[in-house]
Amino acid sequence: MGNVTAENDILYAYWLANISGVGTKTIHQLYKYCGSAKTVYEMSARELSQLYGVTEESAMRISDAKKKWDLYGKWERLVSRGISFVSLEQPNYPKRLRHLYDPPYGLYYIGQLPPDTPSAGVVGARNCSSYGKKMALRIGKCLGSNGVCVISGLARGIDGYGHQGALEGGGKTYAVLGCGINIVYPPEHGALYEQIAAQGGILSEYPPDMPPSPGYFPMRNRIISGLSDALIIIEAKQKSGSLITADCALEQGKDVYAVPGRMTDPLSAGCNHLIRQGAGILLSPEEVVSELGLLSEKNKLPLEKSQRLVYSCLDLHPKSMEEISGETGLDPVTLAQLLDGLEERGLVRETWQNHYISVN
């Protein structure tokens, strides 16, 4: 048990978060009026029922839960599974979430909790296109390599590629689940789940072993946007869970960016709609990095000779790889590698397939 004692509020908070049949709204009411889970634990059913918003049925459930809950034993079993728990009562509860209208009372996590440093949410279509995949990887990598934490939901498609890009960029990334913390969903993201836990963290407001349910995902979306300073949408249909996340972000006063797409592409309908409604048009991930004031020092380093050769022949007018190769004398393979490196540093941007411009 280490230094956990009966006086440690986390034991009572863990109990309060797990009372069957008592909803989040009631838990918030109890916390508001009582100030701590320990105080709730020490109250009788009659005292609880006299609190505003607490029904007699809820009061009885809470009272009965004390008899069935082993404070020490339950906590030991949780810790033995490698799972951590934090509540609104603890000082290490994520600061950004405290300001939400309906913050989760408790969070389960594996790995680390998100630090109070610049972060961006990256979400989008599960059945994304190859272009969407490319953008998610590129954006995630740029954010990660520039010190921006990437927040997403571990879903198929854009979410997973956003996480992967951040990991490839050597950055931290955090996944917010719509199920129990120990459930890998979708199952094919097992390896990615482990990488995220090792290089960031996995979070959920739902207790361990809770299976995924359609109703849980809209709820977790408010946490994704809540943990983010800015939200990036990469491909979304007109009716999409990503738009719910965008609504959450706007309600929370966060900046929302959307990657534009073709008018005829259903996967771009949601993003184009957001842009029409006033969302920022994301033309390069460096825009978000710049807005967060985190342009990496590596972008200020001098270029190598071959990089200068490529960069010097570019301007604001798009040039094809064939044109660049002709001007520099570089073979296509070498040129592609150099362009990728310059793009990572935010110095060039691909405007459409194999056409590039300089950025700075």
Spans of model-derived segments:
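Glycine-biased, small-residue-rich flexible motifs in mid-sequence functional cores and linkers
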Residues: 2-7, 87-360
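Short, small/acidic-rich helices and loops at N termini and domain boundaries
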Residues: 1-91, 321, 345-355, 359-360
